[in-house]
């Protein structure tokens, strides 16, 4: 969710405007600037919190340390993940202190330390002749493919206010133990935003003497104030400030005029969506493509004035930059909102309707969340679908990235509806948290919750919420030893690393080393990170666990936003070795969601690793027949010998999707696992359809987003697959919403229309193995009506790293299938348990080493009172 480098420059220079008069820039390098408006350079920056630390870094850099690596490890600026890349800058538009600091600095050299309101900055002028700098966004490892040259990848414009909100919260005074109390962080967020808004309003006051306020300063101040309003969705006030910034740019900062024009278009389009209810009661408005490409119900807005203004701004922009694919895409979306796509779109900018459809029809997955009572409107967050009440029915729990936003716990009533029981469950105080997952850490038979906080922002404590088996939860984070140190994280995986029957916990942190906690019999956890060899800093955004080499011990994969990913092979003694390079799975770079799954049913866990390239331009290039320039996600097929093969292109996944939340399931019960990707980034310009990919017999993935009607345009986060109506097929539960309160959105529950194939659900209960059976392997042999047999493989777990499906395994069998045998491998007892005679289309419970199984009643219900699918 962090904004990417070309847009991050706004924060860097806006900080000069946000500063109060008592905290101006300190001029380090004196003398007039020799630059002119044509002096464009590419800059990198490192920002730290003290002058002493900055000077130490200068010494290190001058001694030969790599600037990109130091920026990633030390910088507190939002550009850190990209090695401090600010992008191409016109020097004459910079504040005087920054211009002066760069006087006489040649390409490849450093500036002196510059005091800015967010800290102390070191600038570097990038040398384009240096091969190391020709790919501006190259990851630190040579194994990672670069994004391309700096002119090839166009990052999305920053329009949301999140970067500004993060910066002011970072700088805000903090009381003792602030990172241990979510309510304190909520108060800090509100106070820091209010204080910054007042500072900007004071700076822009007409009563303030004009001395020292250049056109650049005024433009940036208006833009920054607009961002603070946009953060909360106050778009009328935001647009007023953006308009003033645009007028100021036209009069005194011509280099910024086009960017401001695009910002106006994006802001008007966002306001249009808000005014038409697309963020509160969207119905089909946000589903892409709209019915008949914008004609008919659900495809257009009733109030169109702001959409029309957006069109005007986008057209003006495209006259100057006709090859800007991001703005071209937004222009087509704007025409859809007024019901004039494709007929009224200028031919030069039209994205043809033929590019928007699916080649295969999987039926319409209708959103029934409002009818089912899943009435939650929230920012970005995670989702868990599982039985938390012991009723045999799947409940739904969501989290909230907003520092002041609560969790929501919806109890399944068993009649197709859900009732919110957050307060009754004791979860009112669980504010914030971008992601979460479930596990039975104490083996009491009731699923607990791990809530992860601080992802993309300041460090915060996580919360382990023990299920009391009576409909309530108790926060046991401190008691179990998980509260300190507070870290920034949204990535964690549960696994029994030593086969002692207790689930251990891997936490993938961002700016702190990753952590591995050994479960001490359900009473607490011991931090063994250092001795285990996994305490590395890599801005980890996803973690997955599986026994990839089938040696009986679980391994981990860490997906990292900085540098290459890590494949940690279990050494059978509570230590791990990173074998990612030898195994051929360094990842695509800019890693995010990830998971192990057996996509081809050969009995070996394959590996899916996404790349989070925040470029609308790159994501929409296939719609206009262009190949992307940026790095793509990766699908690695397990070769069965400790190595993996990159089959991304071979299976049709060689695209840029901008995925965040993601998970897998079997939408058509054919036995092959499909994928749903939640897309976007915080910017209000990031309007990309979420993506549903159907697995065709383990040989290809086909995009069925359009035919399924699951292409929600707003930000997709936690994803889960689950059969919520007990009719034998999996629904898709998608937590939708951006990173700011002004981009909140309702949850989506896409009801599966059914495909006529058979299925079985297996609820495994560990006895020696952990009670939830996480890590147990299932091999199910089926015979079709022609007498041919095949094997279907599953591993018990909640799925992907961002969103959690039920631990009860739903397995599609295909059409007219007969179950020949179910074989379960239990890790702790190291036994293979075979069950024969199972009927299809039912749910059964199988306990470890038991001689029989139990059939569980799962009565089909009607979601939201609608007629259930046959």
Please give the residue ranges for each predicted region.
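Beta-propeller blade termini
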Residues: 380-390, 411, 432-446, 489-499, ...
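Hydrophobic beta-strand segments that make up the repeating blades of beta-propeller
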Residues: 383, 395-400, 445, 449-454, ...
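Proteostasis/folding factors centered on peptidyl-prolyl cis-trans isomerases
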Residues: 28-45, 73-74, 97-136
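Short coil/linker segments at helix-helix boundaries
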Residues: 180-187, 210, 215-216, 233-237, ...
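Blade-edge motifs of beta-propeller repeat domains
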Residues: 343-378, 410-431, 465-487, 518-538, ...
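Gly/Ser/Thr/Pro-enriched helix-cap/hinge segments flanking short amphipathic alpha-helices
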Residues: 651, 700-870
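Peptidyl-prolyl cis-trans isomerase
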Residues: 57-97, 127, 131-134
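Short, conserved, GDST-rich strand-edge loop motifs in beta-rich repeat architectures
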Residues: 273-301, 452-457, 610-628, 677-686, ...
